Curated annotation (Swiss-Prot):
<feature type="binding site">
    <location>
        <begin position="230"/>
        <end position="231"/>
    </location>
    <ligand>
        <name>substrate</name>
    </ligand>
</feature>
<dbReference type="GO" id="GO:0009089">
    <property type="term" value="P:lysine biosynthetic process via diaminopimelate"/>
</dbReference>
<feature type="binding site">
    <location>
        <begin position="220"/>
        <end position="221"/>
    </location>
    <ligand>
        <name>substrate</name>
    </ligand>
</feature>
<feature type="active site" description="Proton acceptor">
    <location>
        <position position="229"/>
    </location>
</feature>
<feature type="active site" description="Proton donor">
    <location>
        <position position="81"/>
    </location>
</feature>
<keyword id="KW-0457">Lysine biosynthesis</keyword>
<feature type="binding site">
    <location>
        <position position="72"/>
    </location>
    <ligand>
        <name>substrate</name>
    </ligand>
</feature>
<feature type="binding site">
    <location>
        <position position="15"/>
    </location>
    <ligand>
        <name>substrate</name>
    </ligand>
</feature>
<feature type="site" description="Could be important to modulate the pK values of the two catalytic cysteine residues">
    <location>
        <position position="171"/>
    </location>
</feature>
<keyword id="KW-0028">Amino-acid biosynthesis</keyword>
<feature type="binding site">
    <location>
        <begin position="82"/>
        <end position="83"/>
    </location>
    <ligand>
        <name>substrate</name>
    </ligand>
</feature>
<keyword id="KW-0413">Isomerase</keyword>
<protein>
    <recommendedName>
        <fullName>Diaminopimelate epimerase</fullName>
        <ecNumber>5.1.1.7</ecNumber>
    </recommendedName>
</protein>
<dbReference type="InterPro" id="IPR018510">
    <property type="entry name" value="DAP_epimerase_AS"/>
</dbReference>
<dbReference type="Pfam" id="PF01678">
    <property type="entry name" value="DAP_epimerase"/>
</dbReference>
<dbReference type="GO" id="GO:0005829">
    <property type="term" value="C:cytosol"/>
</dbReference>
<comment type="subunit">
    <text>Homodimer.</text>
</comment>
Length: 303
């Protein structure tokens, strides 16, 4: 008999995720520590369900209400994802209904993250303090006069002025004059794997419209082009703030919509506010279930 896995699909500004609830410790190790090939299969938009990543809601290991484990579409483990944690928050609120607590302490590989469901349905997330130390990001770029890692990345004959910020995961910010007329995919995939980032990096091409309005195009580590990146929007504001190019709060325009990002006083936590919405619920067919997730009791079991 095969284990039938229930899942839900959610999106935040078009950044979409498959969510599986394992808070009762009911998931097998083949789901909790999955084969990357299985994650790639279910995230495939032609042969699977299709998503930018997989999120597992798991029992806490420390003082959190639960633990989030997130995998990129290529099967690699991610430290944190801003749009993903908003989707998880909306998922939890939908499950709990009228008993919804409105606030959760969620354990991630980037530390405890605290999202709050607001009355208007938007989700405000305390994303924690940005990492500006090169070793913590990690990057080999060195600290510049603005107090964050800066430098040049060379792509053949092209030299790009860049900055780096960590939000529990690495981000490379590349200011450009025109977002539409850059070799986006070529630069994105090359910068993701640039030698200045030993753990690879998320890449954000940034245009500054005003001190209170930024626009970015996103190339996510392990996923490629996506419609939005919450941690990337936070990192972009931190970088422009320190470089004197923006205020400590701004709306960030992404292909999938708008996030409100603030870094009060340019110290402490960065806050991200934005939406997340359900798309559908489903059950994985046997062909999409983990290869070892076979057999439990006498009947097919939905968990």
């Amino acid at each position: 008999m095969l284990v039938m896995l229930q899942f839900s699909k959610y999106q935040g500004l078009g950044n979409d995720f498959l969510l599986i609830d394992g808070r009762e410790d009911q998931l097998t190790q083949q789901v909790i520590n999955p084969d990357p090939a299985w994650v790639r299969k279910i995230c495939d938009r032609h042969f699977g369900i299709g998503a930018d990543g997989l999120i597992l809601a798991l029992p806490p290991r420390a003082d959190g209400d639960l633990r989030m484990q997130i995998f990129n579409a290529d099967g690699s483990l991610a430290e944190m994802c801003g749009n993903g944690i908003r989707c998880l928050t909306r998922f939890l609120a939908d499950i709990e209904g009228d008993l919804c607590v409105q606030r959760w302490n969620i354990e991630t590989l980037a530390g405890i993250i605290c999202p709050v469901l607001q009355e208007d349905g938007q989700i405000c997330v305390d994303m924690g303090t940005p990492f500006l130390d090169p070793e913590s990001i990690p990057t080999t770029l060195t600290i510049g006069s603005a107090g964050l890692p800066q430098g040049e990345c060379h792509l053949g004959s092209t030299s790009l002025h860049v900055a780096a910020v960590g939000m529990g995961n690495p981000h490379l910010i590349v200011p450009v004059e025109d977002l539409e007329n850059i070799p986006f995919e070529n630069w994105g995939q090359r910068l993701e794997k640039h030698h200045a980032f030993p753990a690879k990096t998320n890449v954000h091409f940034l245009k500054i419209h005003s001190p209170n309005q930024l626009e970015i195009r996103v190339w996510e580590r392990g996923s490629g082009p996506t419609l939005a990146c919450g941690t990337g929007a936070c990192a972009s504001l931190v970088a422009t703030c320190l470089l004197g190019l923006s205020d400590d709060h701004a709306e960030v325009l992404l292909p999938g919509g708008v996030l409100q990002i603030s870094w009060p006083g340019r110290r402490g936590s960065v806050f991200m506010t934005g939406p997340a919405e359900p798309i559908f619920d489903g059950v994985l067919t046997p062909l999409l279930s983990p290869s070892h997730a076979e057999v439990l009791p006498q009947d097919d079991q939905i968990i």
